[in-house]
Amino acid sequence: MQYTYLIIGGGIAGVTAAETIRAHDSHGSIAIVSDEAHMLYSRVLLPSYIKKRIPREKVFLRSIGDFEAKNIVVMSGERVMKIDSVRKEVFLASGRTIFFEKLCLFLNLLCYGLNLSLLLFIVLL
């Protein structure tokens, strides 16, 4: 698989980046890789859902249809194991390899062993 824009991180920052890129580039291919099983949900609303005060669908901030309508590929439940910024490759725990032209990282604070000096950060917009 190869994408013009590869976004690692499916939280609000990653999703907003994908939507913003799409608004400026209607033809480039965009993919979001997230280790979360479900895309963009509100952690704030989870207690209300658990207490059955709101329906499950209210917890999700975007549907898969929202991404499909914008031609954004979502890879949920996929953990990134390695990034090769020179060859522009990302290796997933599932064994898949993704090639990219531009890479955006939206990582949480639990990135153990990440050597930032080896990464190439690209400002997209």
Give the positions of each predicted feature.
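FAD-binding core/adjacent interface of flavoenzyme oxidoreductases
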Residues: 1-6, 63-125
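Beta1-alpha1 glycine-rich phosphate/pyrophosphate-binding loop at the start
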Residues: 1-73
